[in-house]
Regions:
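Extracytosolic ligand-binding ectodomains
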Residues: 1-232
Length: 232
């Protein structure tokens, strides 16, 4: 629903939306009808092994090389991870998606992390490694600022907290719903990667203002954070 509402707000037309079982491993029967449609974009809202398998099937069916009304047919993966890209192999070439962070960023914080991680492990860090690194620093900083390890004090220190220096520019932990907002990286599978860690390239940075939504947005409203439980 989020993909449909966002794209239709920009003037796109949704030809079809198909749900697939989580346990599916062969997506051929779902991909084949796309060939007969007038669609010029396929959004594969899959993750992990499902994304690897569905993208592989889509490329095998020739969708990556298809032309629709003299335009290149595009396949989009909403969120990439290194393991997903590595699992799909050459099938990610030319495929657009997004990611939270990438080791090629040139801000000082990213470069320092890439250098220290690479020195210890011998290869550049993944998005997952970066997330773990940042969350550890944020927790330690919140405890220090709150002067306590009490979960309620830590939560209070993080609510509405804005920080910088971790890549992708300034980041906000919104107090109302504890969601994290920052610039989003649009990436594409590299045509000629130099290694298994060089599969994606940044093609655009979408400003945070374009991806921020209101806490009472219909797709996310209705929940409650409740009251803090200090764990006692």
């Amino acid at each position: 629903e989020a993909v449909r509402s966002s794209t239709e707000a920009m003037g796109w037309e949704t030809v079809n939306a198909v749900k697939t079982p989580l346990t599916q491993t062969d997506f051929s029967s779902y991909i084949a009808p796309v060939l007969q449609s007038d669609a010029d974009v396929l959004v594969l809202n899959h993750y992990g092994g499902n994304m690897v398998n569905s993208l592989t099937n889509a490329v095998q069916f020739g969708l990556r090389d298809k032309l629709v009304n003299n335009k290149n047919f595009e396949i989009v993966v909403p969120l990439y991870s290194r393991l997903m890209a590595k699992g799909a192999g050459a099938n990610v070439k030319g495929i657009f998606g997004s990611t939270n962070w990438h080791w090629s960023l040139q801000d000082e914080g990213s470069k320092a992390f890439v250098k220290s991680f690479g020195t210890k492990y011998g290869f550049p860090p993944s998005q997952a490694a970066h997330t773990t690194y940042v969350q550890t620093l944020l927790y330690a900083d919140a405890c220090e600022r709150a002067g306590t390890f009490n979960p309620c004090g830590v939560v209070e220190a993080l609510e509405g907290f804005e920080f910088d220096g971790m890549g992708n520019g300034k980041t906000l932990y919104r107090a109302e719903d504890h969601q994290c907002f920052k610039d989003v990286l649009v990436v594409k599978g590299k045509e000629n990667p130099t290694s298994e860690f060089d599969l994606l390239e940044i093609v655009e940075v979408t400003p945070v203002g374009q991806v921020t939504y209101a806490p009472d947005h219909p797709q996310v409203a209705g929940g409650s954070l409740g009251t803090c439980n200090p764990g006692a």
